[in-house]
Regions:
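Active-site- and interface-proximal helix/loop "cap" or "latch" segments in soluble metabolic
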Residues: 3, 14-15, 22-24, 36-195
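Generic structural signal for residues positioned in beta-strands
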Residues: 19-21, 31
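A short hydrophobic beta-strand element
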Residues: 29-36
Length: 195
């Protein structure tokens, strides 16, 4: 039986591109820029039966200021350069509800409760939920770009609560957490600090 990839015969009819970039602001904070772009490659009929031409149907930009301990969203802005209806832009300010939200396990559920309902936008919600993982990677890239001391506890590792139990490798009793705990204990032994 052929693979699903081998069954593709025509060009795409739709594309969704998600793009994330992280920019340093200062020693403790980064700005993360996210973009969601939906494009249709053929004309289509809208809900009212009107023919619409192909092209970009959604283009949404989200900017997050990330930092603090525990790691949190310190500020948030959204732009909606391309939406299918003018009314969509009324949901743009809903993103302000996430300011102060900690980046930890359960983040996606909290986002859905805050902005993923009839007061918000499904596309901005999706962008934010996917974006936070990229935000963590960007934050860590920024923090790890310079030598730093071994943390004295797991609590000193920004963003760690988001990762714990997020997948098999990052499970609470898994190899990565165990390795970090051993590194902390070894550092305490070397420096003479009581565990």
């Amino acid at each position: 039986m052929p693979s699903l990839k081998d069954l593709i015969q025509d060009g795409p009819i739709h594309s969704r591109i998600l793009d994330f970039k992280t920019y340093p602001l200062d020693e403790e904070r980064v700005i993360v820029a996210g973009k969601l772009k939906d494009e249709r490659f053929l004309p289509f009929y809208d809900e009212g039966g009107h023919l619409a031409k192909e092209g970009v149907i959604h283009e949404m930009l989200l900017y997050l200021l990330i930092g603090g301990m525990p790691l949190s969203i310190l500020d948030a802005d959204a732009e909606m350069p391309q939406v299918p209806r003018d009314l969509c832009t009324e949901t743009r300010e809903s993103i302000r509800r996430i300011v102060g939200l900690e980046i930890k396990s359960g983040f996606s559920e909290k986002v859905h409760k805050l902005i993923g309902n009839v007061e918000g936008c499904a596309h901005l919600t999706h962008l934010l939920v996917v974006m936070v993982q990229a935000a963590l990677h960007g934050y860590w890239a920024h923090k790890m770009s310079k030598p730093r001391p071994v943390p004295r506890s797991l609590n000193e590792i920004g963003g760690l609560p988001y990762l714990v139990n997020s997948c098999r490798l990052w499970r609470e009793d898994g190899p990565i957490i165990q390795e970090i705990k051993e590194m902390i204990e070894e550092s305490k032994r070397r420096t003479g600090v009581e565990p």
